[in-house]
Amino acid sequence: MAKRTFSTLEAFLIFLLVIMTVITVALLTLLFVTSGTIENHKDSGNHWFSTTLGSTTTQPPPITQTPNFPSFRNFSGYYIGVGRADCTGQVSDINLMGYGKNGQNARGLLTRLFSRAFILADPDGSNRMAFVSVELCMISQRLRLEVLKRLESKYGSLYRRDNVILSAIHTHSGPAGFFQYTLYILASEGFSNRTFQYIVSGIMKSIDIAHTNLKPGKIFINKGNVANVQINRSPSSYLLNPQSERARYSSNTDKEMLVLKLVDLNGEDLGLISWFAIHPVSMNNSNHFVNSDNMGYAAYLFEQEKNKGYLPGQGPFVAGFASSNLGDVSPNILGPHCVNTGESCDNDKSTCPNGGPSMCMASGPGQDMFESTHIIGRIIYQKAKELYASASQEVTGPVLAAHQWVNMTDVSVQLNATHTVKTCKPALGYSFAAGTIDGVSGLNITQGTTEGDPFWDTLRDQLLGKPSEEIVECQKPKPILLHSGELTIPHPWQPDIVDVQIVTVGSLAIAAIPGELTTMSGRRFREAIKKEFALYGMKDMTVVIAGLSNVYTHYITTYEEYQAQRYEAASTIYGPHTLSAYIQLFRDLAKAIATDTVANMSSGPEPPFFKNLIASLIPNIADRAPIGKHFGDVLQPAKPEYRVGEVVEVIFVGANPKNSAENQTHQTFLTVEKYEDSVADWQIMYNDASWETRFYWHKGILGLSNATIYWHIPDTAYPGIYRIRYFGHNRKQELLKPAVILAFEGISSPFEVVTT
């Protein structure tokens, strides 16, 4: 056998892995006592649990309040409430969640992230549901449990685990750090209570606003296909599905968008909920700006259209663009190619003749990732706008819900009269480490790897222990890189207990799945639920998949796709029969709703809530201004004059933006203001939620930093005199005293914008 050699990157990563493991084990030994660190969040009764060790935010025990509900009366329609709130969290000193790329930390803000809540209730108030679309990569179990606890403390039994869905849009440009399972905490470089609290507060605020705004209204539904925004990023895996099944569909991606139009009884617009299958990865893994990617841009455009005269994130109309079965769907429609040669990649392995898998990348339709995001997002928005305008089929019928917690590591699946199979403890395969054509890993591991590597296997066994024969056999043909389901220090590395949930609104069934279904998985999943409803009398149901809901469990491929072990299959953590298990579980929910036997269903084993988590590995240090300068001072002024289409760039003496996430009243890092002669004052025209602005933080040494604000002047900008303001918070630390966070601001010199 030839001697094994490693690239410089691989050798460095091996060294880094060993060092990190030694440090982690030492820290865990010192910091954690695993006994007595698990709490269960119940959905009835009052209780209070410590959020985390070293929490930066403390709260008093909740006091159950009697909410002021609308005075319900009979009418044809539903009570409808919509709400939106900021849930951005940290925009610095934290990993961006999604690509898993080392060093892809947040360094600023392209646009704020929002939680959008939609409450739909029967006219008599007997039943209701809350669907919350959150601009995050995924929903963590910890987020959901905390939100449910706070909802119970404020609203009693009105909003519960069965009628509240939290669904993430899956942007790969949002902050990490809000998880409780060890694998995700390590990927986040620790737990950020600052970000966790910010997100929870944003979700809660959006629900509070929707609850307060409940009013009589009507719901209309529409569907249509979206063209020129998707490709299947694992087409060779898709082809492994039966030809007879593939022949039923015209494409290897789901092109259908489903739209709900929400209006009051006078026909005035209230909001929109849209579900569509696409990965928000138009912003690639070189990005360091927090943003909501293509689906967030679609929501931004729709809300700006409906909320004329309001700044982004403000105004009464709320547009939620939610995720669906996006597992193998990419927006990078120019497809994969070898970036060093321009050649086509190998289709099965996504690798290149020269440079290997790290050179095989897909690209979007724009000149850069920003333009690609705009192009894809605008097409999605335009289709949603068209479907919204023409929606005429009214949704009628009761609001119903069913939910269970399930141990996904031990589900017996009856395939047919003679064959029963089981799910597995979680494990990730080798191809998980390869990444995808949307974001390659840099390691010399290819997609479609069906055999392990002796070196990596030995290194894993020495550091983490050897996978059991049981998990190896159960996960076949997956070669196990990480047997996460057998790792429990300091806490389990991936979840065992997950949520399965269906909420129906009339003839619409929303199936909240805790993961990423591939295209064909989603088709089988929807079809099975629809048939189950029909079997028990609820015919002609429309089933929509709400992806990445309630807890994250990676991917869900078909059994056939699993055999190829590309990225999505290697990331199907509960083994080859994961999809069959979910179909069986959701059929049970559909049957219970259709037969009015939900009350007879077991709630299932409650998920844990871990109290003591690994704190952020990035320390808090005091901010400093250069000698002779103050925070907010201008270092690089604006030019006296700009034309429409040019970019204004102003640099200020800055401070770490994560300080602002601790301030509950902080609303923006910047404003672009125009002087109005008619009122002799400055008027805000843009803020940091505007896609025309960018806020970038340059981290220096010893607490020094700069903040650069960019304004890309749009064609719609009015000529006149403008200025840019910067709002920040600096951390001040005096000897033997607790740190304090102080607000400051900076103002640029005025400049003129001209049209010619």
Swiss-Prot record:
Keywords: Apoptosis, Calcium, Cell membrane, Disulfide bond, Glycoprotein, Golgi apparatus, Hydrolase, Lipid metabolism, Membrane, Metal-binding, Mitochondrion, Phosphoprotein, Secreted, Signal-anchor, Sphingolipid metabolism, Transmembrane, Transmembrane helix, Ubl conjugation, Zinc. Ca(2+) binds at residues 110, 688, 690, 693. Signal peptide: none annotated. Its EC number is 3.5.1.-, 3.5.1.23. The chain crosses the membrane at residues 12-32. It comes from the Eukaryota. Zn(2+) binds at residues 170, 279, 516, 555. The record marks 74-75 as: Cleavage. GO terms for biological process: apoptotic process; ceramide biosynthetic process; ceramide catabolic process; ceramide metabolic process; lipid digestion; negative regulation of apoptotic signaling pathway; regulation of mitotic cell cycle; sphingosine biosynthetic process. Optimum pH is 7.5. Widely expressed. Strongly expressed in small intestine and to a lower extent in liver and kidney. Highly expressed in duodenum, jejunum and ileum along the brush border of the small intestine (at protein level). It catalyses: an N-acylsphing-4-enine + H2O = sphing-4-enine + a fatty acid; N-hexadecanoylsphing-4-enine + H2O = sphing-4-enine + hexadecanoate; N-dodecanoylsphing-4-enine + H2O = dodecanoate + sphing-4-enine; N-octadecanoylsphing-4-enine + H2O = sphing-4-enine + octadecanoate. Binds 1 zinc ion per subunit. This is Neutral ceramidase. It comes from Mus musculus. The gene is Asah2.
